[in-house]
A protein has these predicted regions:
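Mid-sequence, gly/pro-rich, charge-dense loop/helix-turn segments that line enzyme active sites
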Residues: 31-139
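Regulatory input/activation interfaces that engage signals or partners
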Residues: 159, 163, 169-181
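Short gly/pro/ser/thr-enriched loop/turn and capping motifs at secondary-structure boundaries
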Residues: 3, 30-31, 48-50, 172-174
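Proline-aspartate-enriched helix->loop->beta-strand connector
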Residues: 19-23
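Short loop/turn motifs at secondary-structure junctions
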Residues: 18, 36, 115, 141, ...
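N-terminal short beta-loop-beta anion/metal-coordinating cradle
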Residues: 1-18, 48
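Short glycine-rich, acidic/polar surface loops and turns
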Residues: 146-162
C-alpha cells in the first residue's frame, strides 16, 4: 500500500521482468457524484493529490516533469474501457442467472457501471467527508481516490511504457470507508 511501494514494484516489473505495458488494478474510494460502490473507474488522468512543492513548483506539479496530471495512452485506455463495459454488461453478468441479482442485492449493490476520468492518489486513506469535499473542491471532476495509481503512472511515464489504471469502487471515502473497504 502506498506510492513508494507501488513505484518500487513497478520499477522492478519494468527493469527486471521487462514488462511491455502495465495494467494496474485495485480498489478506490468513490468521489464522483455518480460513482457508486461496485462501479469501475478507468483513469484518463492521474494526479498525486498530496504533491505540494510550492513555492518552488505549483501545487500538484511533479518536479522535473512540469506536469501535474499524467495521461495513459488513449488507445490502451479505450480498449480497457471497452473490455470493462463488456465484462459489466448485463449479458456478461447473467452467467450466474438469477443468483447474480441476489448477490448484488445482498451486498446492497446495483448494476455496476464504468466511468472514465481523473483518479487522485496520495499516501493517506481518505475516510472523512471533509477530506472528500476538499479533494472535490481542489480537483473538480475527480472520480476516485486511492494510494498508488499516480505513482505507477509516473514510473511508466519515466520509462516510456504504456499503462492504464482501473479501480473498483469499494467505498465512498467517508466515515464508513474503513468498514466498507
Amino acid at each position: 500500500i502506498g506510492k513508494v511501494a507501488a513505484a518500487t514494484t513497478t520499477t522492478v516489473l519494468l527493469t527486471e521482468m521487462a514488462c511491455q505495458q502495465i495494467i494496474f488494478t485495485g480498489v478506490a474510494g468513490g468521489l464522483g457524484a455518480d460513482v457508486r460502490v461496485g462501479d469501475v473507474v478507468v483513469a484518463d488522468a492521474l494526479l498525486q493529490h498530496d504533491m505540494d512543492a510550492s513555492p518552488l513548483f505549483p501545487r500538484y506539479e511533479l518536479p522535473g516533469l512540469g506536469v501535474s496530471r499524467l495521461h495513459p495512452p488513449a488507445d490502451l485506455t479505450a480498449r480497457v474501457v471497452g473490455a470493462v463495459r463488456e465484462a459489466l454488461s448485463p449479458h456478461a453478468l447473467s452467467v450466474n442467472g438469477p443468483l447474480r441479482d441476489v448477490h448484488l442485492a445482498t451486498l446492497g449493490l446495483s448494476q455496476p457501471r464504468v466511468h472514465q476520468g481523473l483518479i487522485a492518489s496520495g499516501d493517506q486513506f481518505v475516510s472523512a467527508a471533509a477530506d472528500c469535499d476538499t479533494l472535490r473542491h481542489h480537483l473538480p471532476g475527480v472520480l476516485a481516490v486511492e494510494m498508488e495509481g499516480a505513482a505507477v503512472a509516473q514510473v511508466c511515464h519515466d520509462f516510456g511504457v504504456p499503462y492504464v489504471v482501473l479501480r473498483t469502487i469499494s467505498d465512498r471515502a467517508d466515515e464508513s470507508a474503513h468498514i466498507d473497504f
